[in-house]
Amino acid sequence: MLKAACFIHSTTLPTWGDEILQYMLNYLIQRPIIHCLDFIYVNNTGTPLNIPKIENIHPKIRVVNYSTDPTTFEIPTIREMYSFAKLHPNYKLLYLHTKGISRPKNCITRHPIRSWVDFMLYCTVDKYNICLQLLQVYDTVGQNEMSVL
């Protein structure tokens, strides 16, 4: 039986708050992948999240406010995921993170930020079956967007 889980690195800053995280979580729970996941672990840095508010989105969501220091970046979440993978080698893990939150909301990059998040979700969430097949051969699978300027 497939064992799968999702680890989300969330950085919460005053400008975006939890907007991108909520968008990502709602996207996840509206897709078939939610039935494959045993849990969704959100590891947050920066402004603490309202844990009951986020966990009430879906019963599989668990939130930890790891640190108020956003400059720790993704490292704590990657370490948590690494430790989990060592203890549970049969799990397939999806890693997502709140992209673009350091950019101002009203800047010219607002729409590219949303498309950046959408591309990550499309490649890993919408195409999860392909990712799971590839994980039978490879240790990691991900996406890489390359723009021609």
Predicted features and spans:
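ER/Golgi luminal nucleotide-sugar-dependent glycosyltransferases, focusing on the catalytic module
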Residues: 1-149
